[in-house]
């Protein structure tokens, strides 16, 4: 465990560790995350600013992976430079929820949002990593009764207690759909698979569910509450 192999690739720009010479002779273009870390060198990035590369720019540092080659820059193929960790134990729970520190990209790949074409920058400002909107306003930009034309499946009235089942206690979308785990006592990571709570899977496999993060009546009780509100099939 050292800076050259564990830290430098994501905290510097165009890192060349120099292992081919039998030791460390680390070189880099910038000792921080500069423009070229995501956009590539010089003029080349201005010739293609299309959106499909958005997640590719984020994935190398926001995923649990092993590096197999140096010099990655979009639009290069991610898998030519990195081997992502598989979404299995002990890094993930049996249903795919994050368990260990996996830096969220692996969970996002499991989501319906990813399958529908949502990218990191739809929710996160790429140059600050801040959310594009705060609280539920972020989700309700698409999940409303007049969704963007490219996300028609988001149609619905979700900002109501008939959906979230909590008429009195205020909750946010992420409380149910992006439960968090805390690493190193200070680092909160929200599961980006954006799944619905499944107490039934908790009963079957011992996996966590968002309901039981707040309610202490048990997984069987939580499952019955969901059936009562939404029916046995959704």
Listing of model-derived features with the role each one plays in the protein:
Residues 1, 14-234:
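Primarily the internal scaffold of c-type cytochrome electron-transfer domains
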Residues 3-13:
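N-terminal export/assembly segments and adjacent metallocofactor-ligating motifs
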